Amino acid sequence: MKNVGETGPGKCQLLRCPAAGCKAFYRKEGKLQDHMAGHSEQKPWKCGIKDCDKVFARKRQILKHVKRHLALKKLSCPTAGCKMTFSTKKSLSRHKLYKHGEAVPLKCFVPGCKRSFRKKRALRRHLSVHSNEPLSVCDVPGCSWKSSSVAKLVAHQKRHRGYRCSYEGCQTVSPTWTALQTHVKKHPLELQCAACKKPFKKASALRRHKATHAKKPLQLPCPRQDCDKTFSSVFNLTHHVRKLHLCLQTHRCPHSGCTRSFAMRESLLRHLVVHDPERKKLKLKFVRGPSKFLGRGTRCRTPVVEEDLSHLFSRKLLFHFKTRLETNLSGLFNERQLREPAEPEVNLSGLFQRPQGRAKAEKSA
């Protein structure tokens, strides 16, 4: 452990990390010891939350990770106008010190330099100017990699050590993170949903899947009178109406000899993979609605079936709607009181059943 200088009014000693190539320094010895644990390949701290198999080298890392599971954010900043919340008193104190208070300055210990900084990161970046050397240098023999970021050094050193497979009994070490993920997919599936028995390779994917069981699925019924099918998305409902009820399969395959046609453009893109096996399946990007303009914390309104499919129904006037759709127009008859209450379903049902030729004849008459 090496003392690198004095700072601040109290002249606190700065302790530098003794690891080769690392120039991190701290005020307290406990924080330095915690930092040095990050240089070791051992990760003794394991998350005890169910379906989470993450391990950590430092105690504070696992404490922070567990609090993310529990979503503990109960400590609010007392400063007026500040809405920040924190899960630990230490985080709140650091926020008040650097954001709203007067932090103890870190003075540059190089003779003749009077610069001072509020954060150690800024001081480390400043020290590289005096020495004309990068803060982080790879200590592996034969490697001349340099950088001004300690985080980049840690990521670079993992390339030398490799990424070890976390499965029990597997000694595979991959040179890159991407290669490790490709290797992990070869292992048999071990995680399984207790509700539907669906297998997963990642704990994060299993947690996201479990959230779908808790949510109430969206039920969009088909508006055709003699169809009782329901769908969970507007896209599936639109595809159903275009293909089965309206027979609007306008997207044809451009390959010669192929007579396939589709109701949706996305279905055609998936079909094109059949003609070109080497072509990877496209990740389709669906344009979201105007929810981003509603601001944070607001929910987007559930899309109304009649609004999304109105342009489809206008193509065929003989499309019979369910009586549920006409009831939405009952407000038109509430402006004045009638002696005999009219039924909106009876008065409006003829609009959707009138043939096009008859409508033109009545208009000309």
Swiss-Prot record:
Keywords: Metal-binding, Repeat, RNA-binding, Zinc, Zinc-finger. One of its GO terms (molecular function) is zinc ion binding. It comes from the Eukaryota. The keyword Repeat applies. It holds the Pfam family zf-C2H2. One of its GO terms (cellular component) is nucleus. A zinc finger (C2H2-type) spans 15-39, 45-69, 75-100, 106-130, 136-160, 163-187, 191-213, 220-245, 251-275. p43 is a 5S RNA binding protein which is a major constituent of oocytes and comprises part of a 42S ribonucleoprotein storage particle. The 42S RNP particle comprises four subunits each of which contains one molecule of 5S RNA, three molecules of tRNA, two molecules of p50 (EF1-alpha) and one molecule of the 5S RNA binding protein 43. PANTHER family: SI:DKEY-208K4.2 PROTEIN, ZINC FINGER PROTEIN. This is P43 5S RNA-binding protein. It comes from Xenopus laevis (African clawed frog).
